């Protein structure tokens, strides 16, 4: 995905600093929104999942919650719930706008797992299951269109529920037919 940032939103680092960043384990913000304070004492808002590795190099301060390393699979659903009701925005990856594969990618990233960006690529990772009854909370569920192309992904929860980004990050029922939206009273995927 091609995007843009304001030239006020980045700082150049040298080769030595880059090597240090690449060597250190990844650390991410774990609050919905928190602030970092730069060396000019300006507050900068950062969303859930922001990479905090450069804080020391840039002499920024951060007092919020952090997460790093590979977490137990049981933590995936609780991480997903942090995004609940975030609005849908194609290409988005923050609580201020997120799409289905950006949602699963960010939830897994916060738990120490790397997923591809698009749902059809994520579907190629891991091991496929034959039946929904074989799934566990934290597993990914993929949905295809009439042509067989993967177009949607969500995270399996307990009791035949799924959390996914469709209009917003929401919880719906899931069965062998697909995702049942209680608002529209129909299967949407």
Residue positions per predicted region:
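Catalytic nucleophile-His microenvironment captured as a short glycine-rich beta-strand/loop
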Residues: 140, 150-161
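Boundary regions of SH3-family modules and the immediately adjacent low-complexity/disordered segments
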Residues: 1-86
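Aromatic- and glycine-rich peptidoglycan recognition patches
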Residues: 12, 18, 129, 157-189
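Short, basic/aromatic beta-hairpin or loop at an interaction surface
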Residues: 18-34, 106-122, 157
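A flexible loop/linker signature enriched in serine peptidases of the S9 family
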Residues: 146-147
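Structural motif
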Residues: 50, 138-139
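Catalytic cysteine-centered active-site loop
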Residues: 88-136
């Amino acid at each position: 995905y091609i995007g843009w940032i304001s030239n006020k939103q980045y700082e150049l680092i040298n080769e030595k600093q880059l090597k240090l960043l690449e060597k250190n384990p990844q650390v991410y913000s774990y609050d919905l929104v928190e602030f970092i304070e730069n060396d000019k004492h300006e507050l900068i808002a950062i969303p859930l999942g922001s990479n905090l590795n450069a804080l020391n190099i840039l002499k920024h301060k951060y007092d919020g919650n952090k997460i790093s390393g590979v977490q137990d699979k049981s933590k995936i659903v609780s991480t997903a719930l942090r995004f609940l009701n975030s609005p849908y925005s194609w290409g988005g990856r923050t609580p201020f706008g997120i799409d289905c594969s950006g949602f699963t990618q960010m939830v897994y990233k916060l738990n120490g797992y790397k997923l591809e960006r698009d749902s059809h690529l994520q579907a190629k990772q891991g091991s496929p299951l034959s039946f929904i009854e074989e799934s566990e909370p934290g597993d990914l569920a993929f949905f295809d269109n009439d042509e067989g192309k993967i177009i949607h992904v969500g995270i399996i929860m307990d009791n035949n529920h799924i959390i996914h980004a469709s209009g917003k990050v929401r919880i719906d029922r899931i069965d062998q037919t697909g995702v049942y939206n209680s608002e529209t009273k129909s299967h949407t995927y």
